[in-house]
């Protein structure tokens, strides 16, 4: 049995004074020795925290004693250690940002909820568009079979992508999904206000689908990206597969790294061998960038040799 747990949760509910709430909530979390990242806004709370089983259970009881969060659903993962290094509770304008001119309130408008078994039926329906509401790098390590991959690197880019592809989506049945459900609450509501009539969402997100006793994560390929030190977690309990491809050679890979150029910081899938071979950098420009955090520890001679091994050279001004 694991000694730690990771809790993923959200709740759209009114928080009148997010700044004060954030300070008090941070103090409570630290007292329980939790670590994680929580966003609070007047529209609600969005968090992921880790801690011992005892501490996380205490936190869930603590939240249940607040009428605003009494019915909040927690997605619980077993863990061997903390999934975060620190504890942050931050007030924000939104708990998930679409940066719309006119914000959408999921308590007033949102897509129809599909439970996991209903969502699985939608996956098998050729007349339904399954739309991934996550970022491209999340999709690349794992996604539902047949899902559409929006070319976005940030959630707030999604409405623009929809507008650019409106013709292909017009008059279609749209079912959207995300990690835990929070992004789809707002995004599906926006779709309805944007003129799409038949809009549904996976209730509880991928995390709930993967733990459902009936679906057992079936029709999910790869792993689910998570925003903590675990990076990715398994979902499909029936017939798991690997869909991630190494950025450098296209071989199967589920290991994410960040480009060593801090001005890039792009997330790429790479094996340990290719990380070393390509100096943990996504391009030649990033490899030779003066701020590169990987190459700064190499002597000029070794740097030159490593570049020559991949048919690259230092820029003249550096030589």
Curated annotation (Swiss-Prot):
<dbReference type="Pfam" id="PF00581">
    <property type="entry name" value="Rhodanese"/>
</dbReference>
<dbReference type="InterPro" id="IPR040503">
    <property type="entry name" value="TRHO_N"/>
</dbReference>
<dbReference type="InterPro" id="IPR001763">
    <property type="entry name" value="Rhodanese-like_dom"/>
</dbReference>
<comment type="function">
    <text>Catalyzes oxygen-dependent 5-hydroxyuridine (ho5U) modification at position 34 in tRNAs.</text>
</comment>
<protein>
    <recommendedName>
        <fullName>tRNA uridine(34) hydroxylase</fullName>
        <ecNumber>1.14.-.-</ecNumber>
    </recommendedName>
</protein>
<feature type="active site" description="Cysteine persulfide intermediate">
    <location>
        <position position="178"/>
    </location>
</feature>
<dbReference type="Pfam" id="PF17773">
    <property type="entry name" value="UPF0176_N"/>
</dbReference>
<dbReference type="GO" id="GO:0006400">
    <property type="term" value="P:tRNA modification"/>
</dbReference>
<dbReference type="InterPro" id="IPR022111">
    <property type="entry name" value="Rhodanese_C"/>
</dbReference>
<keyword id="KW-0819">tRNA processing</keyword>
<dbReference type="InterPro" id="IPR020936">
    <property type="entry name" value="TrhO"/>
</dbReference>
<feature type="domain" description="Rhodanese">
    <location>
        <begin position="124"/>
        <end position="218"/>
    </location>
</feature>
<comment type="similarity">
    <text>Belongs to the TrhO family.</text>
</comment>
<dbReference type="GO" id="GO:0016705">
    <property type="term" value="F:oxidoreductase activity, acting on paired donors, with incorporation or reduction of molecular oxygen"/>
</dbReference>
<dbReference type="InterPro" id="IPR036873">
    <property type="entry name" value="Rhodanese-like_dom_sf"/>
</dbReference>
<dbReference type="Pfam" id="PF12368">
    <property type="entry name" value="Rhodanese_C"/>
</dbReference>
<keyword id="KW-0560">Oxidoreductase</keyword>
